[in-house]
C-alpha cells in the first residue's frame, strides 16, 4: 500500500522523472544540462553519443525493488529489475522489461511489458545510458 502522504496526484516526483525520460527516449534530443541525473537532457557522457535508452530500477513505497518476468510465457521464473520507459500518461507508465546479457555486457529488450500506477512508486534509480537493440 502506498504511503498516504504521497498518494495524491500532485506529489509524484517519480512520475515526473519517468515523463522526462520518456520524452528524451522518444526524441533523443541534445541539451545543455550538465547535471548527471535522471533528467540529464542527453544520453551518454556527451551530447554526441548514440544511446537510445536510460534504464531504470524502481522501488515501491515499502522499499522493495520492483521485479518483473522477462517473458510473458506461463511459468517464466527469470525476472529483471531493469526497465525502459515506453509510454507515460499522467500517473500510468508502460515499461518494457530489459534483460541483462552478461556475455556482451549489455541490456536487451524483451517483449514483456507492464503498466504501473506511478503513485505507488517512491524511488527511482537511473542506470548508465545505453543502446538497446530491437526497440
What are these regions (language model features)?
Residues 1-86, 94-135:
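Short glycine-rich, low-complexity segments
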Amino acid at each position: 500500500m502506498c504511503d498516504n502522504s504521497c498518494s495524491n496526484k500532485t506529489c509524484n516526483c517519480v512520475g515526473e522523472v519517468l515523463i522526462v525520460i520518456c520524452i528524451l527516449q522518444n526524441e533523443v534530443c541534445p541539451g545543455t544540462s550538465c547535471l548527471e541525473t535522471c533528467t540529464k537532457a542527453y544520453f551518454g557522457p556527451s551530447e554526441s553519443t548514440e544511446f537510445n535508452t536510460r534504464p531504470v530500477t524502481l522501488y515501491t513505497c515499502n522499499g522493495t525493488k520492483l521485479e518483473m518476468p522477462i517473458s510473458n510465457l506461463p511459468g517464466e521464473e527469470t525476472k529483471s529489475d531493469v526497465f525502459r520507459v515506453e509510454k507515460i500518461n499522467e500517473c500510468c507508465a508502460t515499461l518494457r522489461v530489459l534483460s541483462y546479457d552478461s556475455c556482451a555486457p549489455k541490456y536487451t529488450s524483451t517483449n514483456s511489458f507492464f503498466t504501473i500506477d506511478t503513485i505507488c512508486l517512491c524511488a527511482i534509480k537511473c542506470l548508465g545510458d545505453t543502446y538497446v537493440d530491437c526497440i
